[in-house]
Design a protein with these regions (language model features):
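Conserved N-terminal beta1-alpha1 strand-loop-helix module at the mouth
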Residues: 1-87, 95-97, 104-106, 112, ...
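Short glycine/serine/threonine-biased micro-segments
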Residues: 38, 47, 141-144, 176
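Short, flexible active-site-adjacent loop segments at beta-strand->alpha-helix junctions, enriched
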Residues: 72, 94, 116-120, 141, ...
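Histidine/lysine/aspartate-rich catalytic loop segments that bind and position anionic ligands
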Residues: 116-153, 159
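Active-site/ligand-binding-proximal alpha/beta "capping" segment
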Residues: 141, 148-182
Length: 182
């Protein structure tokens, strides 16, 4: 079994303790900071705007794991300082410019992930498998922290891994997001 990586949700990190959290994350060799970008349109919440993310960049060198839960992700990705080796996920469900998003992220040197909601069939992603580094599977219905885990998503992740392996896509990573507490 492959070793997993942990990405801490900055949406859940209280601003009043941000330096404490970042110090703890650094000491624990945390691989990524999970940055949820929400526009209040694709999901019924607003989270982590450009100024907040710019400030985070100034105070930490931990790579970012962006998750764009927005309409028109191609436009909104350009608002952020996405760097080489950052992970960037955008949703399949509302995106008519998937190829353009993947090309944009490739030019930046970022790892491209396509995110899917609990009810979305992962087979829809097959046309993009040669162009992505990973698939982000939502294990909750997105929008707010603390939502209840959708139990069927655990099997979905297992089935997705088998599907990718069967296609010879063993290099494609699977990221899970939602109500994962350790």
């Amino acid at each position: 079994m492959k070793k997993g990586k942990i990405s801490a949700s900055m949406m859940c990190a209280g601003l009043d303790k941000i330096f404490y959290y970042l110090t703890e994350f650094k000491e624990a060799n945390l691989e990524f900071l999970h940055i949820d970008i929400m526009d209040g349109d694709f999901v019924p919440n607003l989270a982590l705007g450009t100024d907040y993310v710019k400030s985070l960049r100034r105070i930490t060198n931990i790579p970012f794991d962006y998750h764009f839960l927005v309409n028109n992700p191609l436009e909104k990705m350009s608002w952020f300082d996405i760097r080489e080796n950052d992970h960037v996920a955008f949703h399949y469900e509302n995106n008519k410019k998937i190829k353009e998003c993947l090309e944009f992220l490739k030019r930046l040197g970022a790892d491209s992930y396509i995110a899917i909601n609990p009810e979305t069939d992962y087979h829809f992603l097959e046309p993009y498998l040669n162009d992505i580094n990973g698939i982000l599977v939502m294990t909750v219905h997105p929008g707010f922290a603390g939502k209840k885990l959708v139990p069927s998503t655990i099997k979905k992740v297992e089935d997705l891994r088998k599907y990718l392996d069967k296609l010879g896509k063993t290099d494609i990573k699977i990221e899970v997001d939602g109500n994962i507490t350790i």
